[in-house]
Curated annotation (Swiss-Prot):
This is Inositol-1-monophosphatase SuhB. Inhibited by Li(+) with IC50 value of 0.9 mM but not by Na(+) or K(+). Also inhibited by Zn(2+) (IC50 value of 0.5 uM) and by concentrations of Mg(2+) higher than 100 mM. Catalyzes the dephosphorylation of inositol 1-phosphate (I-1-P) to yield free myo-inositol, a key metabolite in mycobacteria. Is also able to hydrolyze a variety of polyol phosphates such as glucitol-6-phosphate, inositol 2-phosphate (I-2-P), glycerol-2-phosphate, and 2'-AMP, albeit with reduced efficiency. GO terms for molecular function: inositol monophosphate 1-phosphatase activity; magnesium ion binding. Belongs to the inositol monophosphatase superfamily. It comes from Mycobacterium tuberculosis (strain ATCC 25618 / H37Rv). Its cofactor is Mg(2+). Mg(2+) 1 binds at residues 83, 104, 106. Changing residue 234 to L: Less than 4% of wild-type activity.
Amino acid sequence: MTRPDNEPARLRSVAENLAAEAAAFVRGRRAEVFGISRAGDGDGAVRAKSSPTDPVTVVDTDTERLLRDRLAQLRPGDPILGEEGGGPADVTATPSDRVTWVLDPIDGTVNFVYGIPAYAVSIGAQVGGITVAGAVADVAARTVYSAATGLGAHLTDERGRHVLRCTGVDELSMALLGTGFGYSVRCREKQAELLAHVVPLVRDVRRIGSAALDLCMVAAGRLDAYYEHGVQVWDCAAGALIAAEAGARVLLSTPRAGGAGLVVVAAAPGIADELLAALQRFNGLEPIPD
């Protein structure tokens, strides 16, 4: 039986509050580090991570530290897996009565560095490797997307709380599709080859630059579908649940060794089979190693 403090609704509330607090922190720190617009590298505030084109900033690490400190106060003893600070290597091995918090302090760091208003704080609560609650704060828009298993998906903004539903599109040719690209040259080449096959099949394609926001846009009906290779669990832990609870069909590949990351697909139900068949036809459901 689920402990009362592990009920999805309660975990969602924790995630929503933390995401909103962290988003406010990110907005303030960005102004301190970069000024009103991008100013160089913020005097050394940006460094490379997995490749020269994969940045991490002092604000990423500061924000994750804030979230870890808050969770230590609110949920002492809960394991934490964060993009910058690491955590359990296998979240599925966590005891069934324990919640693991999966954190991405800034999803869309390149956008953040350049001052493009599409980056997010993502917080997922997982039990046995399955997300049961989560929240994604769109930092620049000052909105929070959230969901809990069986309780639907919602958007909270200055006007209140709104139920999210994905679109009713039923033809792939009329779908607005989101996607993203990895950081390694090899991965990008393979992704570009696949995209060349997919573009003629859809209405148009958007590259937002944040997997968490892409998934939330599917939930909100601002995209009809989204797919991407090389996604990490912290990128999609919250967003995938939000899309699913809004009615989207969501596919997450099984993690594999070798650093390939996950294949993530989310689509309005009326086009999901058609999109999955198209991706399968061009070998687009297989992970792409870095």
